[in-house]
Amino acid sequence: MAPPVIEEYLGSRPSMERCVLLRAQRRNMTRVLNFDRKLFLSLVVKSRRRFFKKLGGSEKEIAARIEEYFSRQRRLEKLGQILTVLELQSVIVSEFTRTLGSLTTPTPAINAAVRRVDAPRARALASRALNSYAVLPPPEEAAPMARHKHSDLVEVVKRLVKEHLRRHNKRCVCYGSYALHLLNPEIEYGDIDMVQTNARPFLINLAFLIYFVTGRQTVLLRVPYLKNYVVLQDEEGGHILDSFNVRQATLRALPTLLVDNIYVLHPFVQLMAMLKMFSQTDRIRDLADNFDKARARMETLLAFALEELGEAPADGRTPLPCAFLPPEGGASRVLEADARALDCGFARAVVFLDEPALVQTLLDMGVQDDEIVDFESVSNSAFLVRDNTLFTYFSNTVLMDGDAVHDLSRRGVSAHIVMFLLLTRHPAAEGAVRSMLGSLVSDARPVTSVVERERKTGTHGVIDIAKNVITH
């Protein structure tokens, strides 16, 4: 005889085989059956009023969608689809009130710190720095950077995400264009970039909030070559929101700045990330079409740095000397950087262009897990300091000037090393940033060849509400 909770959840008596397979899910079924849908409906309706304005349906339509989804399992035949619906219902039951429902409660009185930078102060330096990136010949065929198409739901979601960043600022950190907008309101921004400790349940609940309020179907994708990255798309593949998930310990360790009660990734770290990014060929070519946008972002970061550290020195100690190590059995994809100028506790950095090669090297060295520092998607690499050497991974292309590593890639590798110092709060970190400020402009020597970045492979994970599918 089937346990009563299984019969009640399915709305029918299951076969003995199905009963055995579902027995382990009795606790989740009980929680779903006991879920207060009237209270949930009131939270969804409040969310519609606060964030969706005129976009949402009537309360009657919302109630019908909620009732349909919480009884959907009764109309399904495939066990896999039933388990998918139960898993997603369980996420709503356990997480919605904490992640999204709480955003509808009155805002507590907060004296939020506001920080604005004098961006024009750094405009000339930013322009000279970016002009020195004109080092690539025009492509034979126009190949603009692949950009995702934005959904018409982005503007609605932005209002909600801003409130999420303020209310839950112990669980999420903002970076990118919106973080810079908080420092310089002249910065335009599209979607809002963030890392958080509960990215998957947050986006699942957001997907259901959109569905219950508007009837719009959305899909969540997990991209295999980006660490713990989840993106929410509309029914036509339009980009709504993405987020990186990080461990709580990682989030607590990140250097941040509190602006308008939102924690933003420290501008020094974001500046290093930007300099790393410009070792990438598609980013350099994109400057030709989006120079003003890039300059506005760089001058904002530079203005913050100049205010904190003083004027840039006339001659910085970076970019660090870099060269490829002699190959072992093939073309070398390992760089060595001379880090002595940073006076930071290690004399050199061994920089792998292939992450599996770094992992294998650490295994061969017998490294223990607690010796490795990893800031997940923020640094996009683990770090180890041993025997006066930093071991790490660089995920961008390396530009060459003849047989030598080009200044721009030396700067990118140097920025990666300085980012490590910043993330670990090393005493030499701020001095290293100041040195970078004094070496942002180079002579724009042409790039003669490119060492490609590592190509990562894998299959996308999908959560499709309409099709009742979860693939990992």
From Swiss-Prot:
Keywords of the record: ATP-binding, mRNA processing, Nucleotide-binding, Transcription, Transferase
Enzyme class: transferase
GO BP of this protein: mRNA processing
GO MF, one annotated term: ATP binding
Function: Polymerase that creates the 3'-poly(A) tail of mRNA's.
Family: Belongs to the poxviridae poly(A) polymerase catalytic subunit family.
Assembly with partners or alone: Heterodimer of a large (catalytic) subunit and a small (regulatory) subunit.
Protein name, per record: Poly(A) polymerase catalytic subunit
Origin species: Orf virus (strain NZ2)
Gene: PAPL
